Amino acid sequence: MQRLSPGEFKTLISKERKSHFITPFALVYKTFCDLGYDQKNSDYFLNNPSEYIIAMRKNCWKEFEPFEKEFTTRMLSYLIDEERIKDMSPYDAIRDFTMEYPTHIYDLALSNTQSRRSRAGKEFESILELLMMGAGIPVDVQGAIGKSFFQKNQIGKLVDLVMPGVVQYTSNKRNTMLISAKTTLRERWQEVPEEVNRTGIREMYLATLDDSFSEETINILYEANVVVVTTIENKNFKYKNNNRVLTFEDMLQSAMELSRKWNNVSYTDSEKEEIQRSILKQIEKYSDFPYVVNYYRNRLSALFD
């Protein structure tokens, strides 16, 4: 067997990872349907967003974990030289393997960690996206429309969701909601107020599952017109007396109130065309996911009623 160099193994990890794992959105969508959320009405999502988010996060991890174990086993098996170890005891074979491939093992573990972090963020965005859809709240998604379209309309790259949409944001910022999703804040929270100042965004909701951000961080974000949003459990346990921290329940009620303000708005022909293009692009992006397609088709029908 030809020995793989660390560089060759890294390349193989990257190649195999792309083909082995389903996309974060596909995993979230599968979990969403497996848990029966596709059968829930809008009242459930409006009244129980924290419960939904916690359950989805937990079950997405349960769904993902076997994929990662299988992937790790498969990647390590590429390094096994059966001829070399055939006369060794199990102990000696394991010892020889770890001494022979410490860099390879480290690189695989590091790749798994980095992939987990990246996927966790994308999964959280997708969980919020399906939450808004379930609640019947119109929303445009950067992941479906593209960063360039968001940035062209002076919406920063850190914004993941726009309610009710990008076109509405450009015509009346006051009655729209911008949401940025971050599972944890760490030091990256500083990017958010910088983005708000740079783009002239009026206000941004920062949705997070983090429960370790300080009062100082909350105040800095608040002064920059960034509203921290977390689960009702985090709020009650860590920030009960801080009115500058909202719950997902609060955010959805605000989103619903804002969305109603667009019910009787008369759009220009060019605005309608832009909204239609945006919706059709998202239908194309999610063509394999019936629940999502149905949501966007309903939005399209409402546009021309």
Curated annotation (Swiss-Prot):
CDD domains: Ecl18kI-like. One of its GO terms (biological process) is DNA restriction-modification system. It comes from the Bacteria. It holds the Pfam family EcoRII-C. Its EC number is 3.1.21.4. InterPro entries: EcoRII_C_sf, Restrct_endonuc-II-like, Restrct_endonuc_II_EcoRII_C. The keyword Hydrolase applies. It catalyses: Endonucleolytic cleavage of DNA to give specific double-stranded fragments with terminal 5'-phosphates. GO terms for molecular function: DNA binding; type II site-specific deoxyribonuclease activity. SUPFAM superfamilies: Restriction endonuclease-like (SSF52980). It is an enzyme of class 3 (hydrolase). Keywords: Endonuclease, Hydrolase, Nuclease, Plasmid, Restriction system. This is Type II restriction enzyme SsoII. It comes from Shigella sonnei.
